[in-house]
A protein has these predicted regions:
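Dual-mode signal for accessory low-complexity, basic/Gly-rich regions
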Residues: 66-67, 82-152
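Short polybasic amphipathic segments
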Residues: 1, 71-83, 148, 172
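Active-site bordering "gate/hinge" segments
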Residues: 1-52, 56-69, 76
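Intrinsically disordered terminal and processing segments
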Residues: 145-172
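Short, glycine-/Ser/Thr-/acidic-enriched flexible segments
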Residues: 15, 56-58, 79-80, 87-88, ...
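Generic structural signal for beta-strand residues in well-ordered domains
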Residues: 44, 73, 104-107
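Short helix/loop capping segments that flank catalytic or ligand/cofactor-binding pockets
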Residues: 8-11, 18-21, 60-63, 82-84, ...
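Extended interaction regions within the primary functional domain
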Residues: 45, 49, 113-115, 152-156, ...
Length: 172
């Protein structure tokens, strides 16, 4: 359990562990410049617990901005079941709800890739330093050393069947 209240558990093995090191050197390897992280997707339905975003965490997709107020997520059977907080929670709820294809569609609320930043050249404060242009920061914000990347939505990159535009990436 983290000091902020994050207490998330999940099983792995259904999907591969993927690395991004900044260049594609073999056929079929997805990568982008500024890489330096490792991630995987939890087994379907296995994620349970609580995730808490704190001020200073980064919503890299879709907004490319720092979190301003705490957001608490409750996760059961691989899906977010509750989003509590202020403006940042409302932004997340609205974005994920808008990504649904029907009232029964839960895909935007599914836990997607989870990873860790490992690039000593990536800067947590890059958005504050250079502005919030997504094309400049989406890679580096995912890879600054020590972050845990939490995301929702699609899992097709890892071989899954969930393809939704309701995608959220938050390096914490």
């Amino acid at each position: 359990r983290s000091a902020s209240g994050t207490d998330l558990s999940y099983d792995c093995g259904e999907y591969p562990v993927m690395t991004q090191w900044g260049y594609a050197d073999e056929k079929g390897h997805f990568d982008h410049w500024g890489g330096g992280h490792i991630h995987t997707f939890p087994n379907e339905g296995s994620a349970h617990g609580t995730v808490v975003f704190q001020p200073g965490d980064i919503v890299i997709l879709p907004y490319c901005r720092y979190v301003a107020d705490p957001v608490k997520l409750e996760i059961r059977e691989g899906h977010i079941t509750q989003i509590d907080g202020g403006m940042d929670a409302k932004l997340m709820r609205d974005w994920l709800n808008d990504g649904r294809e029907s009232d029964q569609d839960r895909d935007p609320f599914a836990v997607s890739h989870l990873g860790w930043g490992m690039n000593p050249q990536a800067l947590w404060y890059g958005i504050a330093l250079h502005g919030d242009a997504p094309e400049r920061h989406r890679a580096a914000a995912r890879t600054f050393p020590g972050n845990f990347l939490f995301s929702t939505g699609p899992n097709t990159q890892g071989g899954g069947k969930r393809n939704t535009r309701g995608h959220y990436d938050v390096p914490m």
